C-alpha cells in the first residue's frame, strides 16, 4: 500500500461501485493516523462531526444516493449544510431511536472483519453535492475523496479503512458508564472537558468563535448576543457595543471609542495628531449638554448641602487615560477660555461639557457671572466630570466663611445687585465683580497616584475682559495680561473693635526661612464687619495686616522677589532638593535658588543648616493650638511697622512677604493700597489653618489679603466655624475684593491633617491654605473635609496630606475629592519662573517628598491593595452602596469602587516585581508572572503546544484550523504505525539519524507556527489601521449602525486582550530565545556527530589498510 504525497488527495466527487472494484488499487492520499480517535482527541473542532445529526431518519426518507452501511440509518444533512445552516431545528434524533439503533450496531461493527459492504449508488450526481460523504473533511479541512466508502452510521463521518471506522465507533459512539455522551448527538467522550468543547460545535459560528477551551469558565454572558467573558469588566466594555455608548474621545480628532483598549491604541498611534488646530481645539459640531444644578444659598445662614453626585443628563461615563496622554495632552488644553453665563439657575448650554465663548474671554450680559456647576472638558481622562461648584462653596464656607467663593458662585443676582448698591461706588473695581472661569485643565495623574484638575477663574471687570489677548495657548492666566498696576485701592477691609490688642503681642515667633521675624497676635473674640456705607477712601486695615518693609519693589533690601511662591511650597521644594542631593555644588545651588526664587546665599545657608541638623523636619515654631502666633517670613532685620488706619501711604511700603498667622479667633487681614503701583502683582497665597478652639469664631475675609502682598498669610479657624459662620460673616467683602493683579492662584486645601507639622494644628483638624483670588488660576484643594460636609470624600491618609504637595508658584492645583489634578501653569510674562523639576506631573522620579514634614502621602500604599479602602476614602450611600465621586456609578463593594477609580486615574496598580510592568487588573499580572516562572498551564490538545497566557491559548484555538499541526514525532509515529511492518527495517535503519534530526524538525515546526502567529498579528494590525483610516475618511459618526457594531466588536476583540498580547509578545521572545538555543545545540550536536563519524571512518580506513598489509605479508610468507 503506497502512500502518496500529503494533502494531495484526489477529489472524486461521485465514485461508483464499478470504479472501486479493487480496493487496494485506490491511491491513498493519507493514512488514517490523522484521525484523532486513537489519541482521544476531539474531532468536532476540525469538523462539525455532523453535530446536527438529523436523528435517525427512516430509510425510506434517505436520499437515493446515500451510501449505507449495514445496520445504519444515515442522516440527511451533511457537515457542510450544518455549517451553513447553523444547526437546523430537527438536529438530532430522539433518544429512543438512538437506543434502538445504538448498541446492536456497535456490537455488529466491532465484530466485523475488514470486509466492507458497499451498496450501489444512484447515478444522479446533482443530489450528491450536499451529502456528508461528498463534503466531509478531515481534521485539516481537506476534502476526503473516500469518505463515502465507509461511513459511520451515527455521525456520517467517512473512513478509508474499516479498522479506522471501528476505532471511531469504539471511542465515539460506544456508551459505557465511564463515558460522557452528547445530548444532541451520539458522540461519547472519555473526558468531560472533551464533551464541553464538543458542545461548542452545536453553536452558531458567531458564538463558536469566542468559545475556547476555558469556555466553561466564562460566566459573564452577554444577554444580547450570547458572548461570554471570563471577567465582568470585559462584559461591561462589550455591552457598550450594543448600547452605542462611546465614553472615550480622542482630544485631537474627536473620534469616540467604546473600549478603553481601542482608545489607548488610537492615542499611542498618534495618527490624528496633525488634525489638531493651532490655537486650541474647536468644539463645534458636537453634542451639547445641559448643565444645571440647584441654586446656591444666598446667605451663609443657609448653606446648601453638598451633593457631589448630581446627575447630569447625557453625561458620558468616565474614561481612563494612558500614561503618555496624561503627560502630554493637558499642555495646550489648559488655556481654553471658559466664560460663565449668568443667571440664577445657571442653565448654561455647554459645548461638549465646556463653557466656551470662543478664543477671547468676553463678559456676559449680566454684571455678575454665576457658576453653579462646571462640567470638565471631554478630553482624555474625563468625559466629562461634573463639578458642582456649590459643593466647593460649602467646603470653603467652613474654612473661609464662604466669601471667596461667593464672589464667583453667588446665585442670587438681585442680592448681588442690592449689595453692590450698598457698597461704595467710588472704586471702579467694585462695579464689575464678574467671574470668569478662564480654564479648566485636563486631569492629570501625579506620581504619587493622585489625580489633579485645575479650575481657573478670575474676578474681572467686563471692560477688562475685552482686552485679553487672543493667544491663550501659552498664557494660562489669560486675564493677567490685562491686569496693570493702575488698579485703584481696594476698599475692602475688616475692621476690628479691638485693634490695639494685635499691636503689642508679636514677640515670640520666628520666620520659617529666617530667624529675624518676631511676632505673635493675640486672638480677638469677635469681628466687626466692614460697613458698606463707609467712604471710598482706603479704610484703616486690621492690625493683622502689618507687614515688614521687605517689598522687592518698594524696599531695596528685600530678599524675596515679587514672584515669591508660598512659604510652605518653598520649604517643600527645598526639602525635596535636599532629599535629592544633600550636598549640592555651587552651580546646583544657583539653579535651586533660581527655581525657588530665593537668594543664593539664603539657599546656601538653608542647606548648611539642614546638613548641620539645625532645621528639624517640622516647623521650627509650633505654637499650641489654643495660642496664636504670627510668622512673618522675611529676610530683613527690619521690624514690621504697625498699620495705622490713618496712614494709608505706608501700605505701599509694606513688605510682600508671607504673614503666617496661627490663632484660634483671628481677624482677617485687610489693607488698602494706593492706586499707583510700580510693579505688577505677585503671588500671595493666604494660608488659613483651622484650629479647634472653644473661645470663639474667627472670620477670614477674602479681601483680607491685598494686592501688595506677596507671601502667604496663614490664619487659623476654630473647629466650630460650621455653626458660627451662619452668624458671623463678612457680608459685603466679596464685592470689594477684586484681586486682579495677583499672579498666584487661590490655594484652598482642606485636608485631613492629623499631625501636620508645618501648620502645628491639633489632630483631626482640616487645614485650609487660602491664596487670595486673582486674575490667575485659582487652586482649590479639597481632599478631606470636616464632619460638616460628610459627602465630600477624603483622600488623605491619617498622617499625610497629599494635597499639600510641594507646589511652586507655577504649579496650579485643584483637588476635587478623591481626585487631584495638577498642571504646570505658564506664568505671566512679567513674572517668569523656571519650571520646577522636582514635581513633574506623572513623572517617573523615584524620589518622594518628605512625608514627615510636608504631609505628602504615598497614595500607592492605599490604592495598590485589593483590600477594602480605608473608611476615609469611601462614602456609603443611604443604601449601603459605594458611590464614585466623579461619576454616577455605584458599587456594592468598596473594592469594586477602588478598582473603578483606576479608570479615572489611569493608574496601573498591579506591578510585576521582576520587570516592573504594571497592569490594571490582578489576573493580568498573574498571567504575566507565568512568563518569569515558566509555567504553561494551557495546552492545545491537537498539536500539544503549551501556553502560559489564556489569551495566547484562545487565539491559537480560534485560528488553529489553518495551521495547527501535530508535532513531528507524533506524525512520524502514526505514519509508521499505518505503514505496517514492511517499512520497519527502513525505520530501524534511519532511527539514529531521525532521532538526531527530530529536535531541529520540531524547532522548525514551532518556528513555522510562531511565524504564522506573528503574521496573523501583523495582518490584524494592518486591518485595524485600514479600518481606522476608513473611519476617518467617512466622518466622525458612522451612518451604518450595523457596520459600526461590527467594527466595535472587532475592536473589542482586538483590545480585550491588549495587555494579554503584551504578555504574548514576551512569551514569543522567550520561545524564540529557547528555539535559538535549541537550534544551536542541535547544530552543535550534528556537527559533533559528523566529526565523530569522520573520525570513525578514518579509523576504519586505517584498520583496513593495516589488515591488508598484514594479509599481503602473510601471502608473501
UniProtKB/Swiss-Prot annotation:
Cross-link (Glycyl lysine isopeptide (Lys-Gly) (interchain with G-Cter in SUMO2)): 166, 175, 287, 311, 315, 327, 419, 473, 484, 495, 528, 752
Segments of skewed composition (Acidic residues): 1013-1032, 1042-1069, 1098-1109
Glycyl lysine isopeptide (Lys-Gly) (interchain with G-Cter in SUMO) cross-link site: 327, 752
Ranges of the DNA-binding region feature: 559-618
Keyword Nucleus part of the UniProt annotation: yes
Modification sites for Phosphoserine: 31, 33, 293, 302, 657, 664, 671, 678, 682
InterPro entries assigned to the protein according to its UniProt record, in alphabetical order: Di19_Zn-bd (IPR008598), Homeodomain-like_sf (IPR009057), Znf_C2H2_sf (IPR036236), Znf_C2H2_type (IPR013087), ZnF_E-box_Homeobox (IPR051574)
Induction details: Induced during Neurod2-induced neurogenesis.
Identification of the protein by name: Zinc finger E-box-binding homeobox 1
Native organism: Mus musculus (Mouse)
Source taxonomy: Eukaryota, Metazoa, Chordata, Craniata, Vertebrata
Gene name for this UniProt entry: Zeb1
